[in-house]
Amino acid sequence: MKRMLCGIVLVAAMACPALAQERTKSAEGAKVAITEPANGAVVTSPVTVKFAITGMELAPAGSDTANSGHHHLLIDQTLADPAAAIPADDHSKHFGKAQTEATVELKPGTHTLQLVLGDKNHIPHDPVVQSEVSTITVK
C-alpha cells in the first residue's frame, strides 16, 4: 500500500509541470504605448489615458484569437511576475473589453503609468509586450 501511494505521489509530482499554463507568444515587434497623457505631463484628475497597439490585435479577455490581447494599466507599480495573471486592483486596471482609453481617478502627486498587454487569461505574453513607464503629475 505504501509503495502504491508513493508511486501515485511521484506520478502526480511529475505531471504538475505539464499542468502549468504556457504563456501565449507575442508577435515579433509588437508594441503598446500610452499616447496620452504625455510623459512628464501635469494633469488634473480624473485623467484620461489613451492606449495604442501595433503588431498585434486587441481582443476581449477570454478571446482565443491569435496575436491578440487586451490592455492592463499599471499605476505606481511595475509588472511583478510576467508568468502570473495580472491582478485587478487599485494599481492594476484591466480593460478586458479591448478598450483603447480609460479615465482614472488619481490623487494629487507624481504617478507612474505603464501598459502591459495580457492574453485571454490576463497573463503577459512571451516576450512581454509593455510600454515605457510614463511619469505624470496630478495637480
Predicted regions and their residues:
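Positively charged n-region of N-terminal signal peptides that target proteins for export
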Residues: 1-4
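Low-complexity, acidic Ser/Thr/Pro/Gly-rich terminal tails and inter-domain linkers that flank the onset
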Residues: 29-31
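Short beta-strand segments of immunoglobulin-like
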Residues: 34-42
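Sec/Tat signal peptide C-region and signal peptidase I cleavage site
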Residues: 16-20
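Hydrophobic helical h-region of N-terminal Sec-dependent signal peptides
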Residues: 6-15
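Long, low-complexity serine/threonine/glycine- and acidic-rich segments characteristic of extracellular
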Residues: 21-25, 40, 46-54, 62-139
